[in-house]
Design a protein with these regions (language model features):
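Active-site histidine-anchored catalytic micro-motif
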Residues: 1-139
């Protein structure tokens, strides 16, 4: 069995943002030499997310609006977590909704996506460096 573990680093300017990381992950799958297996892509921070969806700007904007309606950043004192001196409770909630990781099958050496599927890094408390783990295993 082959395996590859790599770290990706992101520093998104601004509080929130989405980064399409599909191409980067595809290059790592090729580097791994795995033909049949699994690829885990995991946000290693509690205010960031990895998720799969369509790479369409309108949809990404809709996510931004929807998440802000569900867990607005302000007023920050609405959250008990922020009463400890933090100001990012909304980011924790947004991450919980969007998820921590994705696992994608590798078939014939390629990520086996459905139509339009892409992998995204979601940042909800930006302006600092954060890590994503990519682990690929298989034959």
């Amino acid at each position: 069995m082959k395996s590859l573990t790599e770290q990706l680093w992101f520093e998104v300017p601004g509080r929130r943002g989405f980064v399409n990381i599909t191409g980067t992950v595809e290059k790592l799958v090729a580097k791994s030499g795995v033909q049949e297996g699994l690829c885990l892509v995991n946000a290693m921070h509690i205010t960031a997310s990895v998720f799969i969806n369509d790479a369409e700007d309108g949809l990404l904007h809709d996510y931004e609006v929807w998440l802000e309606e569900l867990a607005p950043h302000a007023p920050t004192d609405q959250y008990h977590h922020n009463r400890t001196g933090e100001d990012n409770a909304d980011a924790h909630l947004k991450r919980q909704i969007m998820g921590r990781e994705v696992v994608v099958a590798i078939t014939k050496g390629k990520l086996d996506f459905g139509p339009w599927e892409q992998i995204f890094y979601g940042e909800f408390d930006g302006n600092r460096r954060k890590r994503v783990l990519v682990k690929i295993i298989g034959d």
